[in-house]
Amino acid sequence: MKKKLLLIVWFVGICLTAVASVPVVTWDKYSLIIDGRRVCPVMCEVHYSRIPAAEWQQEVRKMKEGGVTVIACYVFWNHIEENEGMFDWSGQRDLRTFLEVCQAEGLPVVLRVGPFCHGEVRCGGIPDWIFAKGCKVRSQDPVFLKYVERLYRQIFTQVQGLQWKDGGPVMACQFDNEYRGSGDYLMALKKMALGIGFDLPFYTRTGWPELSKPVPFGEMIPLYGDYADGFWERSIAETAGNYYKAFNFKAFRSSTAIATEQLGEQEEKLNEGDEQYPYFTCELGGGMMTAYHRRPYLYPEDAYSMAIVKLGSGSNLLGYYMYHGGTNPDGKTWLNEMQRTLATNYNDMPVKNYDFQAPLGEFGQKNPHYYMLRKLHLFMHDWGEQLAPMEAVFPCRQDIPKGDDSFLRWSVRSKDGSGFIFINNY
C-alpha cells in the first residue's frame, strides 16, 4: 500500500512538474510576455513544403544562428489536398515532422493556416477543385466552410500534442491572409478551429487592409508589414508605388503598398482600437520575388534599414517575409505555381523557384543581409526586455516626400530617463 501511495505521489509530481514547465505566454499593448518577462521576438517566414525534409534541421539551425527566435509558416491547402479528399502529409509536406524539428531546436511556431494564404502559390493556396463547387470562397458560405473545416481537422492531426499547452512549439496561428471583408468570417474560422481542438496562447490576422467590420478586441492580434518594392506593381518604373514610406519613421503601423494587385488602392487607416494591440509585424520584406513584368533587385540594406525603421517606430516583434527561400514542390497533376490566375491578377511567376532574394536563399545559402540582420537581432535579444515598454517618439517629419534627403530620419524610444536613438540614412 505504501509503495502504491508513493508511486501515485511520484506520478502526480511528474505531471505537475510537466504542466508547470510550460512557459506562460500573455501580451499587453506593448509586447509579448513570457513567464512574466517582456520579449522582443524575431520571427522568420519559411515554408517547409518548399524545402526538402532532409534539410529541415540544418536550415532551422541556420535561422536560429541568424538570431531568429520564432518560426512562421503557411500551410498551403493545395500542397496537401491538390486532389479532392486526398491529403498528402508525406515527405516535405510532413508538417508534424517539421514542427518536431522546430521543437527540438527550441523555436516556437506561428502557423498561418489559411484557407487563403497567397505566398505566390496558385490561387493563394485554395485548390482548383474548390472553384468547381459553386461556392463563394473566403466567405461564410456553408459549402466553402465545410471544406475549410475538413482542412482544419487535417491540420489539427499534425498539430495535436504539439500545441504550446502540451509543451510543444505551436504558439499561435493566423487565420486567412490580407482579408478586407467582415471580421465575422475571421471569427467563424477561429470558432471552427477552437471547436476542432486548437487551444493556443494567442491568434493573429494580417493588419492590412482595414476590415469592413472589425473583429472584437482581443480575439486576434493584427500583424503588419512593409516592403522595399513589389513584383505585383503594374508599373515597370524603377521606383514605383509608395514603397519609399517603408524607410520613414512613423506612427502609422500598416502599409498601403502590399498586395495591391488584389487589394487595389488602400487608405492609411487602421481598424478602431488596433493601436491598443502590441505593434508586431509578420511581413517585413526580407527580399522580393521577381515576376515576368517586374523584376526588382533588392539590396541587403533594403531589409536592414527597414527593420531598423520598424524597431524605431515602436515594433516589438520583427517578422520577415521571407527569411528563407525555397523551391515549389512537384504536384500530382499540374501544380502550376506561375500565379496566372484572377486571384492574384495574373502575375507571371517562376514555376519552381521561390528564392525571394531572402537572407537564406532557395538552397540555404547565406546572403549578405543574413549577417547584417543578425547584428540587429542580437541587439533585440540582449535589450528587448528594456526596449519593449519604451514608447516611440518622432522628432522628425513622418511624411518625408519621396527622394527628399534634406531631413534627418530618426526616432527615440525611451522610458524613465533612458532610451535608444534610431537613425536611418538609407
Question: What feature does the model see in each segment?
Answer:
Residues 7-17:
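Bacterial N-terminal signal peptides
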Residues 19-70, 100:
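N-terminal carbohydrate-binding accessory modules
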Residues 22, 111, 115-126, 131-147, ...:
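Substrate-binding/catalytic cleft of secreted carbohydrate-active enzymes
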Residues 133, 144-158, 166-174, 180-190, ...:
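Carbohydrate-binding surfaces of carbohydrate-active enzymes
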